[in-house]
């Protein structure tokens, strides 16, 4: 998941790649559970979009969470419409690698997913995650409602307290409204289920997120 053409600066609308009008081809069903990757999803389910570095490992973390109906690797928070992986890796689309998480809030809450998010990557690294460097590896939460926005901001503040108490850095995670989500190519979907020994760059700070624990810091 390393790009030969890395950039740490976000493109402008003028410098971003043009992309294309039609979506790129991808899988129709989830390789692990057989659910429809693109929906329609059962009534009552909600969606979350998270960015934690290379989406291969991130997706595996979330498809294992009880209450998660389906996951998908994709691109979001950028400019270029319907980008390819190669285009995203140039840094000229503005997108970050993300995972779409479709979940049943009666089984797993958004707050619980946030705890999983914070504890499974290092949100202080800016335009990188571990050895993966570039704007497409930045940390992000792309929210679909005011309630998600409030919960994301509250969790960020709580986790920052926990990190600061351990002498760790400042969170660089961006929290923004979810714009278009573009499904990644077929071979990226559920990659580590298809390739169990494949690359996984995911790793946390070792600091527990205090959400739902009844503790501060």
UniProtKB/Swiss-Prot annotation:
Protein name stated in the entry: Peptide methionine sulfoxide reductase MsrA 1
Molecular function terms from GO: L-methionine-(S)-S-oxide reductase activity; peptide-methionine (S)-S-oxide reductase activity
Source organism (scientific name): Caulobacter vibrioides (strain ATCC 19089 / CIP 103742 / CB 15)
Catalytic activity: L-methionyl-[protein] + [thioredoxin]-disulfide + H2O = L-methionyl-(S)-S-oxide-[protein] + [thioredoxin]-dithiol; [thioredoxin]-disulfide + L-methionine + H2O = L-methionine (S)-S-oxide + [thioredoxin]-dithiol
GO terms for cellular component: cytoplasm
Biological role: Has an important function as a repair enzyme for proteins that have been inactivated by oxidation. Catalyzes the reversible oxidation-reduction of methionine sulfoxide in proteins to methionine.
Enzyme Commission number(s) of this protein: 1.8.4.11
Keywords (A to Z) from UniProt: Oxidoreductase
Gene for this chain: msrA1
Residues at the active site: 54
């Amino acid at each position: 998941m390393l790009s030969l053409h890395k950039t740490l600066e976000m493109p402008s609308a003028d410098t971003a790649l043009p992309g294309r009008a039609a979506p790129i081809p991808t899988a129709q069903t989830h390789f692990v559970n057989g659910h429809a990757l693109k929906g329609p999803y059962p009534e009552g389910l909600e969606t979350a979009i998270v960015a934690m570095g290379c989406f291969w490992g991130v997706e595996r973390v979330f498809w294992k969470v009880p209450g998660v109906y389906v996951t998908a690797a994709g691109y979001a928070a950028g400019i270029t419409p319907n980008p390819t992986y190669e285009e995203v890796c140039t840094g000229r689309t503005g997108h970050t690698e993300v995972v779409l998480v479709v979940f049943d809030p009666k089984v797993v809450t958004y707050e619980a997913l946030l705890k999983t998010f914070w504890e499974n990557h290092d949100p202080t690294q800016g335009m990188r995650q571990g050895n993966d460097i570039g704007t497409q590896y930045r940390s992000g939460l792309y929210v679909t409602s005011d309630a998600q926005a409030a919960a994301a901001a509250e969790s960020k503040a709580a986790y920052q307290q926990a990190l600061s108490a351990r002498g760790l850095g400042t969170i660089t995670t961006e929290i923004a409204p979810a714009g278009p989500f573009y499904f990644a190519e077929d071979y990226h979907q559920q990659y580590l289920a298809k390739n169990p020994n494949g690359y996984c760059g995911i790793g946390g700070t070792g600091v527990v997120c205090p959400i739902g624990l009844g503790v501060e810091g």
